[in-house]
């Protein structure tokens, strides 16, 4: 397995490997949801949101279409189709000097997609996330 945080992220996303999230998230990780007002702080809650997202987003249509990468951060643009709705969004990811993800922010468009994701993520999180 690679030591590059983005290579690791792409491997986990491709495999929908929620168990692998534990190894790449920092203990103080913060998740910024497009549908939750406050940041979700801590590794456990960040892992829960990302595991649910693996189930909701990562279907056969999901693909990253662009990646902008700095030394300790990246922006990944993605596209997917969920229930006939075109979803376009970005994952904004930061990591520390050890390569662990410290911040993960998701932004989505259009509004119809935001509403659909809100509904699906709420259902997945209520069901336990995986």
Label each region the model flagged:
Residues 1, 13, 38-42:
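Alpha-helix N-cap/loop-to-helix boundary motif
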Residues 2-27:
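Short acidic-aromatic low-complexity motifs
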Residues 8-11, 23, 48, 52, ...:
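Charged/polar, solvent-exposed surface patches and flexible loops
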Residues 11-12, 37, 65, 92:
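Short N-terminal micro-motifs specific to bacterial/archaeal maturation
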Residues 18-20, 26-71:
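A solvent-exposed, acidic/Ser-Thr-rich amphipathic alpha-helical stretch
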Residues 54-130:
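A beta-strand edge to alpha-helix "cap/lid" segment located at domain peripheries
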